[in-house]
């Protein structure tokens, strides 16, 4: 999703592969996968980010997701 990241592509790709394998193991359709991933993002924000920064970070994440979808399909 991010164009510039402080994380190495290899690390991101390995974690992504693991998450995809779990979703495939459970035969999760797209809508269930999105619910699970959305809940994961919410959990990360509420458990690891201060209340004063949650909305800002959620908006930045949402914007990056929308830009990623627009970029990949146009």
From Swiss-Prot:
The residue ranges crossing the membrane are none
Query: Domain of life, per the record?
Result: Bacteria
Record-linked InterPro entries: UPF0352 (IPR009857), YejL_sf (IPR023202)
Entries under Pfam families matching the protein: DUF1414
HAMAP family, alphabetized? UPF0352
What the record says about family reads: Belongs to the UPF0352 family.
Q: What is this protein identified as?
A: UPF0352 protein MS1910
Organism whose genome encodes this protein: Mannheimia succiniciproducens (strain KCTC 0769BP / MBEL55E)
């Amino acid at each position: 999703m991010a164009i510039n990241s402080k994380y190495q592509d290899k690390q991101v790709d390995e974690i992504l592969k693991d998450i995809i394998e779990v979703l495939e193991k459970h035969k999760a359709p797209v809508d269930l996968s999105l619910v699970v991933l959305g809940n994961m993002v919410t959990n990360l924000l509420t458990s690891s980010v201060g209340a004063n920064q949650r909305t800002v970070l959620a908006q930045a994440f949402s914007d990056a997701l929308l830009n990623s979808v627009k970029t990949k399909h146009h």
